[in-house]
Design a protein with these regions (language model features):
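A short beta-loop-alpha structural element at the N-terminal edge
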Residues: 1-10
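Helix-loop element at the rim of GNAT/NAT acetyltransferase active sites that forms part
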Residues: 10-24
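A structural microfeature
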Residues: 49-50, 141
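Glycine-rich acyl-CoA binding loop
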Residues: 85, 96-104
Length: 153
């Protein structure tokens, strides 16, 4: 993906999660998206069927409270190399298929080479907690908004 996919990402996030469009657009601009490692899945007709948006933003940007609650934990996590999953959206008719797996596996060699873990913040109301837990992600912190997972790679 490239920065040219910013509006596409915002549209998908608004449609999928019901977030405010202006807020999502500011996230896309301000949260250090790693466009080269983000994945856009296309079907055989070149329609977008999935987005995996990776970001270089720091854990404390997602959950500033961790600095007060767990200063040693955040210090140890920030001593490692990590990347964040900002959003992972798959079209309704592709859920339950291999698409999620294939999208993540398409970047896994580079992730394993350049990072120690993947930071995965998941809003409490979303259904992807079990998905990441099945991958082996471990909860390391939670706040009022989300649960933070760490997936060692």
């Amino acid at each position: 993906m490239t920065e040219d996919d910013a509006l596409l990402t915002a549209r998908w996030m608004v449609r999928q999660y019901g977030f405010d469009r202006a807020e999502v657009e500011s996230w896309v601009q301000d949260l250090h998206f790693n466009w080269p490692l983000s994945v856009k899945a296309l079907d055989e007709d070149d329609h977008v069927v999935g987005l995996l948006n990776m970001s270089d933003y720091r854990i404390e940007e997602e959950t500033p409270q961790i600095l007060k609650d767990e200063p040693e934990l955040i210090k140890s996590l920030n001593a490692q190399r990590y990347i964040a999953v900002f959003s992972f959206i798959v079209a309704e008719n592709y859920r339950g298929t291999r698409l999620n797996y294939d999208m993540l596996m398409s970047i896994m060699p580079e992730l394993k080479t350049n990072y120690d873990f993947i930071f995965i913040p998941v809003l409490h109301r979303l259904k992807t907690h079990q998905y990441w837990q099945r991958w082996g992600a471990k909860e390391f912190y939670r706040d009022a908004d989300c649960v933070c997972y760490k997936l060692d790679i």
